[in-house]
Amino acid sequence: MPGPWLDTRHALALVILLCIPAQSFQTGSAAQNTGALPAKEGLEYSVEWRLIDAGKAKLTWSANAQPSHAGWQVNLHLESTGLISKFYKVNDDYVANLASDLCVQDTHVNAHEGSRQRETLVHYDPESRKANYLERDLVKRNVALAKETDIPRCVHDVIGGLFFLRTLNLEPGHSTEVPVSDGKKTVSAKVEAQRREEIKVPAGTFKTIRYEAFLFNNVLYRRDGHLYVWLSDDRRKLPVRIQVRLQFAIGTITLQLEKEEKT
């Protein structure tokens, strides 16, 4: 049971890469529409694994209230539900603090997955161009991993870039390369706008554009797989559906938008 749920959390993180800012890496035409960026928003998703209701996810975005972190904060909460939760309980929280230009400053993860409990802190320093990664095992009360990684001056975590893509107009047939780091590894990953589709999810029926992020197959992760996201084809560019297709032993993980909260 741990394998699918660990991949679900990674899927949530990876899928948000589609929304990392393209800036000078873009290879297609994508005019910016800054009006699409909300001041505050909450998006709630159902999580399905092998056609079973497996969990819930909530993604929130807001201006950062901390004076030392002028910019934005992104929060992701993931929890297992129903029958899955009885066998393998998951309760994960991810927080990313971003500068006003959306470059990541630091991330904090509290992961409770079955008997596994980990806390991970990553600090990104644009001056030294280093990321400092520290992972603690909360059960054994020791340091599981500590390392330093080279990064570019502006880099993006796999969660925090979500809302920037919604300021762009990346049309089908165009792609972008973006710098991404999880604190352990830094890569340049391709994101491709593929085609327009109309899809139905619990939150309603949406006209969308489907994107693929090429993160598997030894890019950011070694596992073979495909990562897709459907953004609404309108000014809001809501992440309506997220899907990770992995090898047969794990299967397909799908997130579908259930509710949008905005102010």
Where does each model-flagged region fall?
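Bacterial N-terminal signal peptides that target proteins for export
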Residues: 1-13
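Bacterial N-terminal signal peptides
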Residues: 11-23
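Acidic, serine/threonine-rich low-complexity disordered tracts
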Residues: 28-126, 164-263
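Acidic/charged, solvent-exposed loop-and-adjacent secondary-structure segments enriched in E/D, K/R, S/T
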Residues: 131, 135-151
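Hydrophobic, aromatic-enriched interface-forming segments
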Residues: 156-162
